[in-house]
């Protein structure tokens, strides 16, 4: 059972960006909107992100960096932070997953898991 002081829940919605994609060049653009909810008992700051992006051919790309879209938000208990970003893949389908490193008000660092989610061109999956 995880510690109730450090409970971060992450949800993601995705969208295929046809206007920014170039299928003839194997470039498929997607946006994703992430909502990070602090269901814990302590305020927590998002320090960094770690994404694992796997395309439909099994190629894996890892992305690490400080914060999200230039921010390191402080999220109070019961509050949330939402942001949008994007990625380009060489295939019509792929999966993203990862984690955020968080810093609780009491100084404890912990990871918030980002469960795998699918990126797919509409109609690409049957």
Curated annotation (Swiss-Prot):
Using the record's annotation, list all stretches that form the ApaG domain: 2-126
The family database entries (Pfam families) matched by this protein are listed as: DUF525
Known SUPFAM superfamilies for this protein? ApaG-like
Q: Which GO terms describe its biological process?
A: error-free translesion synthesis
Give the domain of life.
Answer: Bacteria
This chain belongs to the protein called: Protein ApaG
What gene codes for this chain? apaG
